[in-house]
Amino acid sequence: MMTAAWSDILHEWCARLITRHPGIRWAMTWCPSVASVASGTGTLLLFRRGIEYFPWFVGYLLLLWLSAVVLAHSRRALAARGRRVVGLVVDYTVQTLTHGLLLFLLPIYYASTTLTSRNVSFLVLLAAAALLTTIDPWYRRTIARFQWVELFLFGFGLFASLNVAFPLLRVRSSWGLHLSGFLSVLALTPVFRRPGIPWRNAILRVGVCSISTAILLWPVRDWIPPVPLRLARATLAKDVTDLEPDLPISQISAADLREWGTLACFTAVDAPAGLREPIYHVWRRNGAVVARVALSPIRGGRLGGFRTYSRKLDLGEGPAFWSVDVLTAHDQLIGRVFLTVTP
């Protein structure tokens, strides 16, 4: 009784204060957004150097995130007990953690995205999720109201972070992609468990969803940037000497190309220390694949990227548009190089 009385008095006092000072309502609406931007920017600045330390950051943040997921699952109980303030604190904590992680991931995925390819869609989705968690009114209207949207955002953020962390732990990207999908769903087990449902049933349901997610990621793998791999340098050239391109070009006449008789594609792929990853050069002429060249596996840790190249001798006649895709062993696009052959 005493608690309820104090709660009513506090609610009435807050209502009067907001009525007398309209600016307080505006501050209550937008201050969480400003705080989210500030915390996310601080996280980004703090970890902008030394991506190798990212797994420690992810481990810390995932611990907080999973705690927030468990708390978010108890919101109904908190609301039933009249502890609305506690529920709001839980919501804000989850929103802030989500925003901080997504904002930190954005530049990492941007560096690995080829803007002229389909994997830019994943970057757009990541940016949209970060924007939704930044603007508090949007978050309340589009995410907090619908639990399935909130769950998707949790799972998406977990997947995006684990997809970066596994290669840094020297896990091949082909394995890391599926492990990320599996664990990102498995981590939501506390949310899938409803009152009256045994843990065994919840784990079984989540296990099926986790395995399904890992399998479904295979056909859409080329829509996902191969983080943290990125193309540090890339060019087509007359030749490569001592792992440096000779006469790099982006355009050449058909006569000059005929005189050269060969083209070389030089690429330098930046990768974290300790990672070994097979890569391929896929040559295309006017959109048609004319060669797929397996290269030496890249070894991460070199400043400026691991350098490698491939050559093409049969160049055809006349004007053409050449492109070379740099792919991982399971066809994720690291980058793309173009060359225009003029008449």
Task: Label each PLM-derived region with a short phrase.
Residues 264-271:
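Short edge beta-strand/loop segments characteristic of extracellular beta-sandwich folds
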Residues 291-301:
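Solvent-exposed serine/threonine-rich low-complexity stretches and specific carbohydrate-binding patches
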Residues 327-337:
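Short acidic/polar inter-strand loop motif in beta-rich domains
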